[in-house]
Amino acid sequence: MMTPENDEEQTSVFSATVYGDKIQGKNKRKRVIGLCIRISMVISLLSMITMSAFLIVRLNQCMSANEAAITDAAVAVAAASSTHRKVASSTTQYDHKESCNGLYYQGSCYILHSDYQLFSDAKANCTAESSTLPNKSDVLITWLIDYVEDTWGSDGNPITKTTSDYQDSDVSQEVRKYFCVKTMN
C-alpha cells in the first residue's frame, strides 16, 4: 500500500476509495431499479394483451347474442303478422289460418300496392281482392299514418297528416300508390 506524504494526499486517497464504493453502490442500485422497471413493463404489457383478448371474446359473445335477439325479434314480428286462430263452436272445432303480407293493425291487414294507379283503378283492384281503400279517420291518429301518408283514401283524396282546403286532387288524372285494407277473421 502506498503511504501518503502529506495529509492532503492521505485524505484524497482515502476519499477516492470511499467515493469508488459509493459509485459501485449507485450503479448496482441503478441496475436493480432498471431491471425492476423492465420487469414491470413486461408484466403490464402482458396484462394489457390478456385484457384485450378477454374483451374481444366478450364483445364477440355480446354481438352474437345481439344478432340472436334481432333474429328472434324478426321471427316474432313475422309470427305476429301471421295470425293463427282457433274458432270453436258447439259442435265442431275449426283451425283457421290467415296471413297478412302487409301491416297488421286491430284486425285489419293493410297491403301496399306500390304501382301508381288512378283512384278508380285502385278502388277496383281493392274491390277485386275483397278489400277496401283505407279510411283517413281510421289511420290518422295511429302509427299507420307514417306508412299510408300520400296514398289513396276511401274518399278519393290522398291521405295526409294535415288537412287544408287546397288539397283537392283531380282523381281522373292523378296517380298514387295505395293500400288495400282487408278485415282478418
Swiss-Prot record:
Side Virion surface, residues: 57-185
Claim: ATP-binding is one of the keywords in the record: no
Record function comment: Forms a complex with OPG162 and OPG190 to coordinate the incorporation of OPG164 into wrapped enveloped virion (EV) membranes and, subsequently, the production of actin tails. Therefore plays an essential role in efficient cell-to-cell spread of viral particles.
Taxonomic placement: Viruses, Varidnaviria, Bamfordvirae, Nucleocytoviricota, Pokkesviricetes
Annotated keywords: Disulfide bond, Glycoprotein, Host membrane, Membrane, Signal-anchor, Transmembrane, Transmembrane helix, Viral envelope protein, Virion
Compartments where located: Virion membrane; Host membrane
One Pfam family recorded for the sequence: Chordopox_A33R
Species this chain originates from: Vaccinia virus (strain Western Reserve) (VACV)
Protein name: Protein OPG161
UniProt xrefs under InterPro entries: C-type_lectin-like/link_sf, Chordopox_A33R
Classification via Gene3D superfamilies: Mannose-Binding Protein A, subunit A
Glycosylation sites: 125, 135
Topology, Intravirion side: 1-33
Family to which this protein belongs: Belongs to the orthopoxvirus OPG161 family.
Transmembrane residue ranges: 34-56
Membrane topology: Single-pass type II membrane protein
